[in-house]
Amino acid sequence: RLASTFFAGNPLKGKAPLLVSALMYTNPMMIYFGQELGEKGMDAEGFSGEDGRTTIFDYWTVDTIRRWRNNGKFDQKLLTEDELSLQDYYAKVLNICNSSEAVREGEFYDLMYVNPQLQKQYTFVRHSEKETLLVIANFASQDTEITINVPEHLFEYYGIKENTACEWTDLLSGSQITTAFSSNMSPKLN
């Protein structure tokens, strides 16, 4: 379990890996039982004891799932604000997989080979005929401002005119800006 004290210890550390693994290719995405709620798996259940895992052999219920189900109501009333926020994040990312043509059907273009300065961020482009997504995952524990290099080859390969003003939408927050898609961009990351 990602949130287990035996592993990452914090479910928020799974946000950047989710973004990368869900949006990188057209593959299906599997979310482990309760991961979207920050399930820690730290109960001392069954034969395994407290080991940061959830037993699959014993009659056991996972606390976050039990509270989410709320006796079949699925009304989220028993979830904490942190759990609701994380669940919302997972829903947004997974909905992008379905709603974005670039993710659903498009091509992957890695940008890391021209961005060796990035130590805790990972960036790539997903492109289809109708849509281009610039994906930036911030693995750092704090907000940061970075410069992203985009090779001229990307513009040539996809037939995109460099320095053309584009309307950019942050698909997680909904905020929009208009700026040029250029070979040297400086976005601020949360």
Descriptions of predicted regions:
Residues 1:
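Secreted, luminal/periplasmic, and some membrane-associated catalytic domains
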Residues 143, 175-177:
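Flexible, glycine-rich phosphate/dinucleotide-binding loops
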Residues 4-166:
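Loop/helix patches that line or flank the sugar-binding groove of alpha-linked glycan CAZymes
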Residues 134, 177-178:
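Structural signature of nuclease core domains in nucleic-acid processing machines
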Residues 167-175:
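GAF sensory/regulatory domain recognition
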Residues 178-190:
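C-terminal beta-strand-rich structural cap/linker in extracellular carbohydrate-active enzymes
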